[in-house]
Amino acid sequence: MAVDEDKLNSFIGKAMGDLGAAVGAALVLIGDELGLYRALAAESLTSAELAARTGTTERYVREWLANQAAGGYVEYDAERDSYHLNEEQALCLADDSGPVDLPAAYSIVDDLFHVRERAVANFRTGAGMEWGEHHPCLFRATERFFRAGYNASLLPDWLPAMDGVVEKLDAGGSAADVGCGHGVTTILMAQAFPRSEFVG
C-alpha cells in the first residue's frame, strides 16, 4: 500500500486538533464547575490568586490557565503574569444568565461520553434510547443552554404569538407545561401570571 505522506500528515494534524478540542471541552467543564471563569471575569488574577479565590490547588490551576490561554479562552498579561476574561469571553463563559452559555453547550456533549457504552450496544442491536435514559448532565445542560432563549422570548414573543393565550393566563387559566425539563418555562409563566395554575 502506497501512503501519501502529505495526506497522512494532514489527517494526523486534523485528528490531533480534534483530540485537543476534546481535552479542551473537558477543561471548560472543569473551569465552569470550579468557578474559575467567574473569578477571572471579575478581575485579573495570577494562578496563585485564582487558586486561593476558588479553593483549588495552584499547580492544577496553573496548568488549566496555560491550556485556556493557548486555546484563546482566557487572556494572559505577561507583564503581571496574570489572567482575565475579556468582555466577550466573560459573556460566553462566566454569565449563565446571558444570551450564550458555552459551558452548558459543552455539558450537552459530555452526555455522549456517559452513554457511550449504551450507544455502542444500540449500534449493534438497532435499539433506541428514551430521552429520560440519558445522563443527568444532559438535562442540567439543556436547561442552562436554553434558559437565555426562554428568558428573552417566552413572555414577550412566543406566548403572545398564540391567539388568546396571554389573556386567558391573565384571567386565571390552567396550563400544563409538557416536557418542561427542569421547569424554567413553567416558573417564568407562573411568575408572570399569578392568577393561573401551572403544572409542569
Question: Model segments located where?
Answer:
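A short acidic, leucine-rich amphipathic alpha-helix
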Residues: 49-54
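Conserved SAM-binding motif I beta-strand of class I
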Residues: 197-200
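Conserved Class I S-adenosyl-L-methionine-dependent methyltransferase catalytic core
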Residues: 2, 6, 14-33, 38-39, ...
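Conserved beta-strand/loop positions that form the S-adenosyl-L-methionine
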Residues: 178
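Conserved SAM-binding loop of SAM-dependent methyltransferases across substrates and taxa
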Residues: 182-195
